[in-house]
């Protein structure tokens, strides 16, 4: 940071204050001096200025850019290295994109353009030139460039040189001889050769620092030269014809000496008159410019044309080489006449009001009252510009405008310049100023113009205050507009948040409604599921009830006593894969299939089934007395059709399917009644050869007559099968479709030949044969 960091920060805050109305050059120059003399490091200073440049307030940013411009122009290479790099250029480009203030944007463009022109011959600062070219390609409009803006006075203190001996006396450095550096030339010296201290203005070092003796002498010689140069003639005198005259005093003869004596006498007289006039002037000054009044009265001064219009006095000593312009100032009679007229004219003690005073708009400033004071009579009075309006050209009481003001200032400047030149000329020639009437007359003329000059200064101060007030009002308006813009932005933000909140509430309500509808849907689905479960339970209950009823029916059948069943109506049918009964009922009831669990044969059905029915079929009815005891054993487990003869157990069904195997219950005592009866012989039906496979056989439906049975003769109808019985007839022509088991080999089913083609291998059965019974159970 450096030793002067606190001072630097204070000066930087002062130079970039937002309360400034114009640039504070004094603080900026002090900042430059701190950096140049090394009290503040260049890197720290540039970083601090960058922070001010990035400030939100555009006034602070603009003043910070002014500080950066001055630092770059006055502080040399150390600052150039910190500013003319890629990081700083990128920061300025970003600031240009973000900044909306026109003045700040123009200042950034102006600085980049000036730096690009100043560093165009420096290869290490080429990034500035590249940035300038890129911004031109991007379309940025740079302000008008003046080459004088890129003139940098970059003188800085030289770098210190390191060595082992003194640069002047060549003494080796050691423990007792320390190294010292001269701040002016940068060389290394011993303590004796660098014992002087001096300021170095060209490097901005205003405090006394250690320098070597040659540099000290050089700096002091320059200081003495500057002190003597203050007495040199100004450029106005050097360009005038008076400067071309010979400055050596001419050779004096007797005539010249006499003229000199007369001149001295005239000067003495003029001095006495001047003293008297000085007393009168002081009195008039006290009355015309009271200390309590802020606006002093103005006095009219003779214009430049009136000073040169009088004829030249022939008695005045003039040489041929004297300028005629100077001769006019040496006209004593003219100035004496002017003094007499000034004494006769009264001096007003009160200000003279104007007929139409100029109104001062705004700020409550009152227009100053113009007072005409004529210490020297003249034909034309000089204008006194009042403070006019801000949008119109200021008018004076005599109708003259700013041009008269400029003429007055030009005449005053010429009078002062001539007065100074005359004083210097007298000094160089060794003349006494008190004896020079031209100097006295010029002094009186300038003294008469002085009050009017003060009046003009007061008016300018009032106008400055007025415009400063306008600038304050503009700043207030700008701040008010900024506050209004902020309020509008805040209002828009509030509306946007309210809209977002309303949208969020609407989304929440929609989500709640959707959740309620989902819950209702879930409840509806749950109710439907419960109803479906309830229906399934009811169906299951009904099925269980039916199963219970069937079980009860089966139990009732098992518990009912057996009744004798006449077998005369039964027709023996062969079992082909199952047992099928073809009852011979009434014509209105065709033969049906009775599965397991059927209710046929129950007492309820026995009422109808017990009615006699005509026998249907080609075979006669079987007498009930021809029962054979061995027929009881021919009971097939599945309900199906029976044949005329009972087949042996090996021929009852195919062995491929155990589900169709014949069930052979043990004969009981209940079947003895049936066995005691003699069965009726049936016609012999040839039995076809047994096939290893069972197939589906379709033919014409044949009604077979049988005696209906009931629960009482159920047990008696169950046949018993014996090994001595003939084999069961497997097929009868004209029977309903039968189901036979398919062969495992997948071959086509073998169809039984019709009855007409079957050989009559068997004759009618014997008297002792038993008829085969069919079970519907």
Swiss-Prot record:
FYVE-type Zn finger ranges: 160-220
Membrane topology term: Peripheral membrane protein
Gene3D superfamilies in the cross-refs: 1.20.5.1940, 1.25.40.90, Zinc/RING finger domain, C3HC4 (zinc finger)
Amino acids binding Zn(2+) 2: 182, 185, 212, 215
One of the protein's GO biological processes: endocytic recycling
Compartments, as annotated in UniProt: Cytoplasm; Early endosome membrane; Endosome, Multivesicular body membrane
Highest taxon of source: Eukaryota
UniProt modified residues of type Phosphotyrosine: 216, 308, 329, 334
Matches recorded under SMART domains: FYVE (SM00064), VHS (SM00288)
Compositional bias annotation for Low complexity: 290-311, 753-768
CDD domains: FYVE_Hrs, GAT_Hrs, VHS_Hrs
Ubl conjugation is among the record's keywords: yes
Region of interest (Interaction with SNX1), residue spans: 225-543
UniProt entry tagged with the keyword Nucleus: no
Tissue specificity comment: Ubiquitous expression in adult and fetal tissues with higher expression in testis and peripheral blood leukocytes.
GO terms for MF: phosphatidylinositol binding; protein domain specific binding; ubiquitin binding; ubiquitin-like protein ligase binding; zinc ion binding
Renumbered residue ranges of the record's region Interaction with SNAP25 and TRAK2: 445-543
Record's comment describing the protein's domains: Has a double-sided UIM that can bind 2 ubiquitin molecules, one on each side of the helix.
Quaternary organization: Component of the ESCRT-0 complex composed of STAM or STAM2 and HGS. Part of a complex at least composed of HSG, STAM2 (or probably STAM) and EPS15. Interacts with STAM. Interacts with STAM2. Interacts with EPS15; the interaction is direct, calcium-dependent and inhibited by SNAP25. Identified in a complex with STAM and LITAF. Found in a complex with STAM and E3 ligase ITCH and DTX3L. Interacts with E3 ligase DTX3L; the interaction brings together STAM and HSG, promotes their recruitment to early endosomes and decreases STAM and HGS ubiquitination by ITCH.
Protein name: Hepatocyte growth factor-regulated tyrosine kinase substrate
Gene giving rise to this polypeptide: HGS
């Amino acid at each position: 940071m450096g030793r002067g960091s606190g001072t630097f920060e204070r000066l930087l805050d002062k130079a970039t204050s937002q309360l400034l109305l114009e640039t504070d050059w004094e603080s900026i120059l002090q900042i430059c001096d701190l950096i140049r003399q090394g009290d503040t490091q260049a890197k720290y200073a540039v970083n601090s200025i960058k922070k001010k440049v990035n400030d939100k307030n555009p006034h602070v940013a603009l003043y910070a850019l002014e500080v950066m411009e001055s630092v770059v122009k006055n502080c040399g290479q150390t600052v150039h290295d910190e500013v003319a790099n890629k990081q700083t250029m990128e920061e300025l480009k970003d600031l240009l994109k973000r900044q909306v203030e026109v003045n700040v944007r123009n200042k950034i463009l102006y600085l980049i353009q000036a730096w690009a022109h100043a560093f165009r011959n420096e290869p290490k600062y080429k990034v500035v030139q590249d940035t300038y070219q890129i911004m031109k390609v991007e379309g940025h409009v740079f302000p008008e460039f003046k080459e004088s803006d890129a003139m940098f006075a970059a003188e800085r203190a030289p770098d210190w040189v390191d060595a082992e001996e003194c640069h002047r006396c060549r003494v080796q450095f050691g423990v007792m001889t320390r190294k010292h550096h001269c701040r002016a030339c940068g060389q290394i010296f011993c303590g004796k050769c660098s014992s002087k201290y001096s300021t170095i203005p060209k490097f901005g070092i205003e405090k006394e620092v250690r320098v070597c003796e040659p540099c000290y002498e050089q700096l002091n010689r320059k200081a003495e030269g500057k002190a003597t140069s203050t007495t040199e003639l100004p450029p106005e005198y050097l360009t005038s014809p008076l400067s071309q005259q010979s400055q050596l005093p001419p050779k004096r003869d007797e005539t010249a000496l006499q003229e000199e004596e007369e001149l001295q006498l005239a000067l003495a007289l003029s001095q006495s008159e001047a003293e008297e006039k000085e007393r009168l002037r002081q009195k008039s000054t006290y009355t015309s410019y009271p200390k309590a009044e802020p606006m002093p009265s103005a006095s009219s001064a003779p214009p430049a044309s009136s000073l040169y219009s009088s004829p030249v006095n022939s008695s005045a000593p003039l040489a041929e080489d004297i300028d005629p312009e100077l001769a006019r100032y040496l006209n004593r009679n003219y100035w004496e006449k002017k003094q007499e007229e000034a004494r006769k004219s009264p001096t007003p003690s009160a200000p003279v009001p104007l007929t139409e005073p100029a109104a001062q708009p705004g700020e409550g400033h009152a227009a100053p009252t113009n007072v005409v004071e004529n210490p020297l009579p003249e034909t034309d009075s000089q204008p006194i510009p009042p403070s006019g309006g801000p949008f119109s050209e200021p008018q004076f009481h005599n109708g003259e405008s700013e041009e008269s003001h400029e003429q007055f200032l030009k005449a005053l400047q010429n009078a002062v310049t001539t007065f100074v030149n005359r004083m210097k000329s007298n000094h160089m020639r060794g003349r006494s100023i008190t004896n020079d009437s031209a100097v006295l007359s010029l002094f009186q003329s300038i003294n008469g113009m002085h009050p009017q000059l003060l009046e003009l200064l007061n008016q300018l101060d009032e106008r400055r205050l007025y415009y400063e007030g306008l600038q304050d009002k503009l700043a207030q308006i700008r701040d008010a507009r900024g506050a209004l813009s902020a309020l509008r932005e805040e209002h828009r933000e509030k509306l946007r948040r309210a809209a977002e909140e309303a949208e969020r509430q609407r989304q929440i309500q929609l989500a709640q409604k959707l959740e309620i509808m989902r819950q209702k849907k879930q409840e509806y689905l749950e109710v439907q599921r419960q109803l479906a479960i309830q229906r399934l339970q009811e169906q299951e209950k009904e099925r269980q009830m039916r199963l219970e009823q069937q079980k009860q029916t089966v139990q009732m059948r098992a518990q009912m006593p057996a009744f004798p069943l006449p077998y005369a109506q039964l027709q023996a049918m062969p079992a082909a894969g199952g047992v099928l009964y073809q009852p011979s009922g009434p014509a209105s009831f065709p033969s049906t299939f009775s599965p397991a669990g059927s209710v046929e044969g129950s007492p309820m059905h026995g009422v109808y089934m017990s009615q006699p029915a005509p026998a249907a079929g080609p075979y006669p009815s079987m007498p009930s007395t021809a029962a054979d005891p061995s027929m009881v054993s021919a009971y097939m487990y599945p309900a199906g059709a029976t044949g005329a003869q009972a087949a042996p157990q090996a021929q009852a069904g195919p062995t491929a399917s155990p589900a169709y195997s014949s069930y052979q219950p043990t004969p009981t005592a209940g079947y003895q009644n049936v066995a005691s009866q003699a069965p009726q012989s049936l016609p012999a039906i040839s039995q076809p050869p047994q096939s290893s496979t069972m197939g589906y056989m379709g033919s014409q439906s044949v009604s077979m007559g049988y005696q209906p049975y009931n629960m009482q003769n159920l047990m008696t109808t169950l046949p018993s099968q014996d090994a001595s019985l003939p084999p069961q007839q497997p097929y009868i022509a004209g029977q309903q479709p039968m189901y036979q088991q398919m062969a495992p080999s997948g071959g086509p089913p073998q169809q039984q030949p019709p009855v007409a083609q079957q050989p009559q291998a068997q004759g009618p059965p014997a008297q002792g044969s038993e008829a085969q019974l069919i079970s519907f159970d």
